[in-house]
Amino acid sequence: MAAITAALIKQVREETGAGMMDVKKALTEADGDVARAKEIIRAKGIQAAGKREGRKAQEGTIASTVIDSAAGQTGYAVELNSETDFVAKTPKFIDFADTVLADAVKAGADDIDAVLAAPSQDGTVKEAVEEASALFGEHVKVGQFAKIEGPKVEIYAHKKSVEMPPSIVAMIATDEAGAAVAHEAALQISAMGAQWLTRDDVPEDVVETERRVATEKSLAEGKPEKIVPKIVEGRLNAFFKENVLLEQAYVKDPSKTIGDLFKEVGGQALAFARLEVGKAPEADA
């Protein structure tokens, strides 16, 4: 039997990210053959990954990029989740997030399903993520994905602390003139979390729910029925100002709205997206 040296263990650990005992067992089973040991770790790891899927993965990072495209520019952002911030801030995890992003861009993915189905090395992104769960020893998953297009796309990536990778990414697509204030708009999206670009983008069922709640609240407060409609409209406008990007007060100068910024440069905001780690609809999975 070949000697299992510290150098061999170190080599396999660096190449796989697996724990010391897992590496030692794999090398022993493989009789010191590094390639075979890596195969064993991969095979056993994928089996272990299935057991991890029920564990919560709400930490992680967001990888993002802008590329030139037929539309002018296209912005991509992918959230990769782990269970702990300890794993999320490791160079290997951050590099893997960048790899998933690159695979998504190369495949021209439009949604998470397309990201997971995208080719990646010897298989798909889905398979690579399963292997990553084994290598990092945690449940790893693709949490969110966003893609926007326009003549110009601006991205702002926010870090909660200098040692952590980005936890919020804001992307905004504008026309050429609007690019002059796109960075400020992206900062606003990151900080204030707008949900829609214009009030026309707010789904009718959401508006009706807000209208109903505002009406019931006004009546419960004992407001005279004849002035309730006016109060309701005021509360609806407040809802729009809080949740519609172009109607939000500019955080650096509340006397202006984000819409005013674009008017000042004669530009337009066309679309935006905001991803925050752990905030996917299925983030509790």
Curated annotation (Swiss-Prot):
Regions crossing the membrane: none
Pfam families: EF_TS
Molecular function GO terms recorded: translation elongation factor activity
Chain coiled-coil ranges: none
Compartments where located: Cytoplasm
Spans annotated as Involved in Mg(2+) ion dislocation from EF-Tu: 84-87
Keywords assigned by UniProt, alphabetized: Cytoplasm, Elongation factor, Protein biosynthesis
GO cellular component terms, A-Z: cytoplasm
Family classification: Belongs to the EF-Ts family.
Database matches in HAMAP family: EF_Ts (MF_00050)
Role noted for this protein: Associates with the EF-Tu.GDP complex and induces the exchange of GDP to GTP. It remains bound to the aminoacyl-tRNA.EF-Tu.GTP complex up to the GTP hydrolysis stage on the ribosome.
Entry protein name: Elongation factor Ts
Organism encoding this protein: Bifidobacterium animalis subsp. lactis (strain AD011)
Gene symbol of the encoding locus: tsf
